[in-house]
Amino acid sequence: KLIEEAGAIVVPKDSPYQDINQLVEAWKKDPKGLAVGGGSSPGGPDHLLPMQLAQAVGIDPKAVSFVSYDGGGELLPALLGSKIAFGASGFGEFLDQVEAGDVRVLAVTSAERVDALKDVPTLKESGIDLEFTNWRGVVAPPGISEEDKAVWIDAFT
């Protein structure tokens, strides 16, 4: 693991939900009706995050309406066009739209607040017992020489 990226729970600027707890309360009442989108396939981090969030707040993940998009490039227009109620992805996917005022981040999923979103609470600060980060790393092909392995380890440490 080289780094880890916090996830973010994001709504369009005109969403009625002002904080994560308001969203969760509405989601509990209608998990199928409040669709969540993510920029990865089922089983990927953007899918796992809302499923774990659902479980953490007492929603059966099987009841969640998840819409899979092929990356943030498809997720953002769906969110901005109100095709989904909220999005779940790495916080970096949304920074430009946050700065433009097009979306609001209700919570980040790391243990600590994210410097780029210092006014946004973590899930734990909001009373939700969940921490979720996406690890980033480097892989090498099978059979890499010890010499090449050492070069890469030195480069990243």
Could you say what each language-model-derived stretch is?
Residues 18, 93-157:
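C-terminal lobe and pocket-closing loops
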Residues 23, 79, 123:
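Residue-level signature of catalytic and energy-coupling elements of molecular machines
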Residues 27, 52, 73-87, 92-102:
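Short helices/loops that flank or line small-molecule/ion binding pockets
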Residues 48-49, 76-77, 117-121:
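Short, well-ordered secondary-structure micro-motifs
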Residues 69, 88-89, 108:
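Short beta-strand and adjacent tight-turn residues that come in two discontinuous sequence segments
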